[in-house]
Amino acid sequence: MEMLSGSEMIIQSLIDQGIKYIFGYPGGAVLDIYDSLKSTKKIKHILVRHEQGATHMADGYARATGKIGVVLVTSGPGATNSITGIATAYMDSIPIVVISGQVSSSLIGYDAFQECDMIGISRPIVKHSFLVKKTEDIPITFKKAFWLASSGRPGPIVIDLPKDILNSYNKKPYIWPIEVNIRSYNPITKGHSRQIKKAIDILKLSKQPVIYAGGGVISANCHNELKELAEKLNIPVTTSLMALGAFPGNHPQNLQMLGMHGTYEANMAMHYADVILAIGVRFDDRTTNNVKKYCPNATIIHIDIDPTSISKTITAHIPIVGNAKNVLQQILVFINSNMFVKEFYCLKKWWIKIQSWKNKNSLNFDTNSDNIKPQSVIKTIWKLTKGKAFITSDVGQHQMFAALYYSFQKPRRWINSGGLGTMGFGLPAALGVKLAFPNETVICVTGDGSIQMNIQELSTAMQYELPILILNLNNKSLGMVKQWQDIIYSGRHSHSYMKSLPNFIKLAESYGHSGISINTPKELEKKLQLALEKLQNGHLVFVDIKIDASEHVYPMQIRDGGMNNMLLRKNGQK
């Protein structure tokens, strides 16, 4: 059998793992890998324009497909440029594997050219990291890395590869491991039957229950089980920002998103609930507000694959450790076998109360304005795409408008940086999604601040012919910063106004793309339809939309209050 070099073993390991795409940027420490990559047609490499873009593309690909995204960067600045993307994936539990080059083993620790301690730098923001010290360790290291990235609570893995490992030859034939065993890592996948029985007993007695679904529902692919459980028990469902689409947006039991900018009915239902069934959530501060005032009358049932997430922020009265899909299936088996549904209590009074909160119409906005409302942009694009598009977003007001006004019916259609809140995520993530689903409509919703963080990836889109639609909600300001300054800092605007902006249309055209400008409400739908037609003809279309700069996102929770403390839009209020 032919002996392989370290770099050849890496490529073969990726092939054996079933990897189809690598997002990367070459440099001296990884040129051996790139040389070996050239000899295979089984893996397509996407040459990005910045390593942060590579990590976000891999991230977007992973979120949309449920598969592992792979990144390849060189040592030193190549590795450090990937850090923001790694942290983004870590905060949202997204499986990516980052392969970073390193200086030769004999030079590590001697401040060699483009040396940095990638293992040390990335340690707080990875699920695990590997420094490969022997060429023969490459296959088992890659096998472990991909298994760790996708098992249990998913997350990013870093594999650091000294240059001398890449051009050395193994003394034994290459063999891809059939299985991997890490004694210290054995995630619990099924819930304890005693805890499940406790949870069901509590739910049976509940008068005002709520199901709170988080991103873990999407990671575990248990949206069908969630829907079945909710319908059997007639319990209202609310989702986190990360879980939009895990429960159909148009379902009558859906209270929509909860949290800082969640709907009035979702937050009120959470506050007054007597039982909360939390599935795959981590109770972050944007969904709890003041933890001391959080859902004061609720018994918390918390299902999560990661035991360290349970009772970390909010104490769980009934903790259930396990894969969310397995646990929900266990609950459903118990309910069905015990004819629990037929004897289930009536929640009529609870639904009447919820309807009274819905009647507040907390997502209302002025539809007769002379200026384009960002809500109108999202609702119009939803209408034109029939709610079937993949939507990626950056971070800010536009992110919240997209989350609130584009009703997602399926999981993995909403791609955003929820935990780290990374500006510059939307465009490269959209390219990763488009690569995975070339026949689907992919839309990046962004703002004039965020889009400039990674706008160079327009070049990548042109090189690989990845037609996406970019909706730039342009208010000439850092919208969410400005909103906070208006509401919390008494209107004192400090460095939130973008005085000098590029001509986005000409900028897009300079990369070879199409550009459309929208300035009035009357032309909004017509020009968005035109943009979609151009998109179907294979063009990336950059739509610059001049929106009402005074528009704020409502509802908005009051700082340090309970879930029920919110600011709502009033008549005439911006």
UniProtKB/Swiss-Prot annotation:
Residues that hold thiamine diphosphate according to the record: 51
Bound cofactor: record note: Binds 1 Mg(2+) ion per subunit.
Source organism of this protein record: Buchnera aphidicola subsp. Schlechtendalia chinensis
Positions annotated to bind Mg(2+): 448, 475
InterPro entries assigned to the protein according to its UniProt record, in alphabetical order: Acetolactate_synth_lsu, AHAS_TPP, DHS-like_NAD/FAD-binding_dom, THDP-binding, Thiamin_PyroP_enz_cen_dom, Thiamin_PyroP_enz_TPP-bd_dom, TPP-bd_CS, TPP_enz
Pathway: Amino-acid biosynthesis; L-isoleucine biosynthesis; L-isoleucine from 2-oxobutanoate: step 1/4; Amino-acid biosynthesis; L-valine biosynthesis; L-valine from pyruvate: step 1/4
Protein residues bound to FAD: 153, 261-282, 304-323
Family recorded in the similarity comment: Belongs to the TPP enzyme family.
Residue segments, region Thiamine pyrophosphate binding: 397-477
Names of the cofactor(s): Mg(2+); thiamine diphosphate
Misc. comment: Contains 1 molecule of FAD per monomer. The role of this cofactor is not clear considering that the reaction does not involve redox chemistry.
GO BP terms in the entry: isoleucine biosynthetic process; L-valine biosynthetic process
Protein known as: Acetolactate synthase large subunit
Subunit structure: Dimer of large and small chains.
EC assignment: 2.2.1.6
Keyword Transferase applies: yes
CC terms in the record's Gene Ontology section: acetolactate synthase complex
Catalyzed reactions: 2 pyruvate + H(+) = (2S)-2-acetolactate + CO2
Gene Ontology MF term list: acetolactate synthase activity; flavin adenine dinucleotide binding; magnesium ion binding; thiamine pyrophosphate binding
Transmembrane parts of this sequence: none
One Pfam family, short name: TPP_enzyme_M
Keywords in alphabetical order: Amino-acid biosynthesis, Branched-chain amino acid biosynthesis, FAD, Flavoprotein, Magnesium, Metal-binding, Thiamine pyrophosphate, Transferase
